[in-house]
């Protein structure tokens, strides 16, 4: 039997910044247990007044708590004078955005 501390993280967030833009890559499950991690990881880029590209191309699961985190982050980035844009997404992310009528709320990169 393995302990919880040895289990791989349910969510991984990597932030890189260059040329006035932050790229945030999210992998794993974005849900009630991990949504706070995303918000915490984006606290600094959100206040930088830059474009924040959110790559959700490795998100395997997202629920309403994950969606709420995306909305909170988007508002924080906007309040900081920047803009949040979605890069890659998965069918799970696209489906949730479509079902909730929020597909147009998040501008897309390119």
Locations of the language-model features?
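STAS-like cytosolic regulatory interaction modules
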Residues: 1-61, 72-110
């Amino acid at each position: 039997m393995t302990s919880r501390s040895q289990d791989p993280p349910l969510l991984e967030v990597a932030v890189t910044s260059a040329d006035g833009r932050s790229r945030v890559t999210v992998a794993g499950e974005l849900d009630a247990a991990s949504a706070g991690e995303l918000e915490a990881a984006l606290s600094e880029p959100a206040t930088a007044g830059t474009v924040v590209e959110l790559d959700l191309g490795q998100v395997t699961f997202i629920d309403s708590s994950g969606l709420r985190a995306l909305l909170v982050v988007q508002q924080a980035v906007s309040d900081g004078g920047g803009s949040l844009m979605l890069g890659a997404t998965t069918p799970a992310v696209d489906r949730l955005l479509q079902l909730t009528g929020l597909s147009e709320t998040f501008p897309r990169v390119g």
